C-alpha cells in the first residue's frame, strides 16, 4: 500500500511525503524536495558570465572568460553532486534495523544503516535554527557501556527539514514498529 501527501518544509517550500507500507513490521517514508529549476541555473550562469564579460572588457584578458565558464561548470557539478538532495528515504524493518538514504540531484546516493539492536528510541527533538525553533526527527543509539545511556543522536531528514505535522506522522509509525519489535523480542 502506498500513499502520498503534499507538505511544506520549515521555510514554506513544497515537500512530498510518500509512505509505502510493506507489512506491519516494514515501512518506508520518502520525502521529496522540488527539483532545481532551469530558471535559477540560467540566472546564476548569466550573472557570472556577465560579470566575467564586464571584467574582460576592462582588462582585455580572455582568461577571465575561460575561468568564468570553468568555475560555473565546476560549481554547478559540485552543487548537484554534493549539496542538492532530491529525496531522503527512511526504511524501518523491525527485525533488521533502520536504513536512511539520501539521493542527490546528480544521481549519487548515500546510505546509512543502523541495526535494530543499537536503536534505543526514535524521538522528535527541538533546536534553535536561524532565530526559530525547529523540530527534527532523530534516532537515539544505545550506549554499549551504560545500559540506560545514549551514545549518539542521529538526525533524520536533515536536508528536507519538514514541519512538525510531517514529523509526527513519521514518528508515530516508527513507534508502532519499535513497539512491535519490542513485543516480538520479549515474547517467548
UniProtKB/Swiss-Prot annotation:
UniProt-annotated location(s): Cytoplasm
InterPro entries according to UniProt: GPI-GlcNAc_Trfase_PIG-H_dom (IPR019328), PIG-H (IPR044215)
Gene Ontology cellular-component terms listed: glycosylphosphatidylinositol-N-acetylglucosaminyltransferase (GPI-GnT) complex
Keyword list, A-Z: Cytoplasm
Quaternary structure, from the entry: Component of the glycosylphosphatidylinositol-N-acetylglucosaminyltransferase (GPI-GnT) complex composed at least by PIGA, PIGC, PIGH, PIGP, PIGQ, PIGY and DPM2. Interacts with PIGQ.
PANTHER family per record: PHOSPHATIDYLINOSITOL N-ACETYLGLUCOSAMINYLTRANSFERASE SUBUNIT H
UniProt GO BP: GPI anchor biosynthetic process
One of the Pfam families matching this protein, by short name: PIG-H
Predominant place of localization: cytoplasm
Function: Part of the glycosylphosphatidylinositol-N-acetylglucosaminyltransferase (GPI-GnT) complex that catalyzes the transfer of N-acetylglucosamine from UDP-N-acetylglucosamine to phosphatidylinositol and participates in the first step of GPI biosynthesis.
Originating gene: PIGH
UniProt family annotation: Belongs to the PIGH family.
Keyword Nucleus among UniProt keywords: no
Recorded metabolic or biological pathway in which this protein acts: Glycolipid biosynthesis; glycosylphosphatidylinositol-anchor biosynthesis
Name this protein carries in UniProt: Phosphatidylinositol N-acetylglucosaminyltransferase subunit H
Amino acid at each position: 500500500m502506498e500513499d502520498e501527501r503534499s507538505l511544506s518544509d520549515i521555510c514554506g517550500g513544497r515537500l512530498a511525503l510518500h509512505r509505502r507500507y510493506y507489512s506491519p513490521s516494514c515501512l518506508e517514508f520518502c520525502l521529496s524536495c522540488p527539483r532545481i529549476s532551469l530558471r535559477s541555473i540560467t540566472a546564476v550562469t548569466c550573472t557570472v558570465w556577465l560579470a566575467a564579460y564586464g571584467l574582460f572588457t576592462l582588462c582585455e584578458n580572455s582568461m577571465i572568460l575561460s575561468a568564468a565558464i570553468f568555475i560555473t561548470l565546476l560549481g554547478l557539478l559540485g552543487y548537484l553532486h554534493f549539496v542538492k538532495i532530491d529525496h531522503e528515504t527512511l526504511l524501518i524493518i523491525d527485525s533488521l534495523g533502520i536504513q536512511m538514504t539520501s539521493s542527490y540531484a546528480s544521481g549519487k546516493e548515500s546510505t546509512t544503516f543502523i541495526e535494530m539492536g543499537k536503536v534505543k528510541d526514535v524521538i522528535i527533538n527541538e533546536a534553535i535554527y536561524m532565530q526559530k525553533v525547529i523540530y527534527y526527527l532523530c534516532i537515539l543509539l544505545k550506549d554499549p557501556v551504560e545500559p540506560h545511556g545514549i551514545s549518539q543522536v542521529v538526525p533524520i531528514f536533515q536536508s528536507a527539514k519538514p514541519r512538525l505535522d510531517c514529523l509526527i506522522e513519521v514518528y508515530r509509525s516508527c513507534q508502532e514498529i519499535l513497539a512491535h519489535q519490542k513485543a516480538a523480542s520479549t515474547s517467548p
